A protein has these predicted regions:
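A short, surface-exposed alpha-helical micro-motif characterized by mixed small hydrophobic
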Residues: 220-222
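Conserved ABC transporter NBD signature motif
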Residues: 73-81
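Conserved ABC ATPase signature
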Residues: 153-157, 161
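Hydrophobic anchor residue at the start of the ABC signature
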Residues: 167, 195
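ABC ATPase NBD coupling module
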Residues: 25-29, 82-98, 116, 124
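A short, proline-enriched helix->beta-strand linker immediately N-terminal to the Walker B motif
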Residues: 172-176
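Conserved ABC ATPase "signature" region
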Residues: 130-148, 201
């Protein structure tokens, strides 16, 4: 067993099921099981890949771990059981785990500048304007984007650049865990390789743990020490 201090995330019998409602009264008649109960442990600076076809429940699992949908079982992040916390109790912990989605264009607000997008989560922290600006600059440099991209909008960037912005938005909060849901599937092979290389470098620099969800075994093997 890994030593307790290095354990970032552990799942115990975590499952996801959606109610099937029928009839005039819209009563629950049955459940669709999206994720069968599973156990998992993830250490600091480790990457685990979850591979499966579309519809296999991979995204449901990611959303459950991020507490964006309900699940059964125990999700323990940094010794806190997320499934036992209210949304209010969860809020200060959200900086410790971030999610990067498949399509950066739909997950980035088209009306916001890159600076506003990356800095959005910092508004909840007690930081001065200068500190926020400095953190945004640092995040842009870490994902290898020019500082002057701050004034641009998502539609002005390529797919690969938008995914780097999505990573910078996660990174700026200095999380312990990043959940990546098909983060390279909308990108060409060359851009995929560049993003995987960047993820490796960020992990080495910040000791971040990754839960990497993909149907692409080649990409998963390039990044992950373990594959489920």
């Amino acid at each position: 067993l890994p030593e307790q201090s290095s354990l970032v995330l552990s799942l115990h019998r975590v499952g996801v099921k959606f109610p099937i409602k029928k009839g005039l009264l819209n009563r629950v008649k049955d459940y669709f099981v999206a994720v069968k109960p599973l156990d998992l442990s993830l250490n600091r600076a480790e990457s685990i890949g979850i591979v499966g076809e579309s519809g296999s429940g991979k995204t449901s699992l990611a959303l459950a771990i991020a507490r964006l949908i309900e699940s059964t079982g125990n999700i323990v992040l940094l010794n806190q059981n997320l499934n036992r916390l209210t949304e209010r109790q969860l809020r200060p912990l959200r900086k410790d785990f971030q999610m990067v989605f498949q399509d950066p264009f739909s997950s980035l607000n088209a009306r916001m500048t890159i600076e506003q997008i990356i800095g959005e989560g910092l508004g909840l922290q007690k930081l001065s304007k200068a500190e926020i600006s400095s953190r945004i600059d640092e995040a842009l440099l870490k994902v290898e984007l020019p500082i002057d991209f701050k004034q641009r909008y998502p539609h002005e960037l390529s797919g690969g650049q938008r995914q780097r912005v999505a990573l910078a938005r996660a990174l700026v909060l200095r999380p312990k865990l990043i959940i990546l849901d098909e983060p390279t599937s909308a990108l060409d092979r060359t851009t995929q390789r560049a993003i995987v290389k960047l993820l490796r470098q960020l992990q080495a620099d910040y000791q971040i743990s990754y839960l990497f969800i993909s149907h692409d075994l080649q990409v998963v093997k390039a990044l992950c020490q373990r594959i489920l």
